[in-house]
Amino acid sequence: MSENSHIKVIVGMSGGVDSSVSAYLLKQQGYQVEGLFMKNWEEDDNDEYCAAADDLKDAQAVCDKLGIELHTVNFAAEYWDNVFEYFLAEYKAGRTPNPDIMCNKEIKFKAFLEFAAQALGADFIATGHYVRRELRDDKYVMCRGLDDNKDQSYFLYTLSHEHIGQTLFPVGDIAKPEVRRIAEEQDLITHDKKDSTGICFIGERKFKDFLQKFLPAQPGVIEDTDGNNVGEHEGLMYHTLGQRKGLLIGGMKEGSGEPWYVVDKDLERNVLIVGQGKDHPRLYSNGLNANQLHWVDRIGPKGTTRCTVKTRYRQEDLSCTLLVGEDGMARVLFDEPQKAVTPGQSAVFYAEDVCLGGGIIDSVIK
């Protein structure tokens, strides 16, 4: 009998290949494995309802194949209160939030963790995230996933060492192609299912159409960097820094004749500011200020620290100097100017392969 046979692990089953293989691997390792499918969104149209129903069907098929029980739970109320309302408030304030990070914090590693422990008697939970956990100096740290292309530590920086200690990440030290190969070898229905992309509650819908249902758009003018009126926008919330498509001013050939890009937003005047050329100087910043800091070890760096930072997912690590102030703000100075650093997104800090934590970008330093 396996030494793990008395340890109960509840796997978050999404209906995707990563959680499917996670459940399979844990079963192979002798754990007592059960699945839990979370419903986080009350669908408002048939397409989204079908997508969620398909995911549940796939999760059930995988659990049946593996011979494990699948539980379901509805966290739609928690999701609305803690993730969706934050998402809307950030857009209303002119920032560009990352709801996946908030979902991990409030749902997967709070509501799910508590439900699994209290209602299902879990010793551990497990997810299909591409990160690794290691015990260093009596504390768990979160390391990047072995597959650089799939590493998801950026989305999990709000976890603490206690969360990591209670969670298993079975695919964290496996490359994605190998995960798919295992799924195919085991004849799991999800082996060739495409990875989900975009914001889960929007799905395949047009972002603009979705947002319009919840936030009234405030049209305004588009100005170039010299203050000239060059067009009109339908709402600042539809635009992000560095954006080229959807500006509806493509026919203008003024200035250099290069394409127009969003370089700034003037929230007070409700003005979208654009410049020509993908490397327009206004797109670059020398650093950033971040708030709502969270450190995995719950202590964090003190004073001035050399480390690396990511200001968006899949970005290469940027060398920087990090200064954490007494006021709970982080001031980050890049070694080289960086493009399209966006308030509302997260800045996540690393010491080599270890994710230290991060915060929300409040403003940029020009």
Swiss-Prot record:
Cited Pfam families: tRNA_Me_trans, tRNA_Me_trans_C, tRNA_Me_trans_M
Enzyme Commission number, as recorded: 2.8.1.13
Gene Ontology CC terms: cytoplasm
Region (Interaction with tRNA) residue spans: 150-152, 312-313
InterPro entries assigned: MnmA-like (IPR004506), MnmA-like_C (IPR046885), MnmA-like_central (IPR046884), MnmA-like_central_sf (IPR023382), Rossmann-like_a/b/a_fold (IPR014729)
NCBIfam families xrefs: PRK00143.1, trmU
Protein name (record): tRNA-specific 2-thiouridylase MnmA
Taxonomic lineage of the native organism: Bacteria, Pseudomonadati, Pseudomonadota, Gammaproteobacteria, Alteromonadales
Gene: mnmA
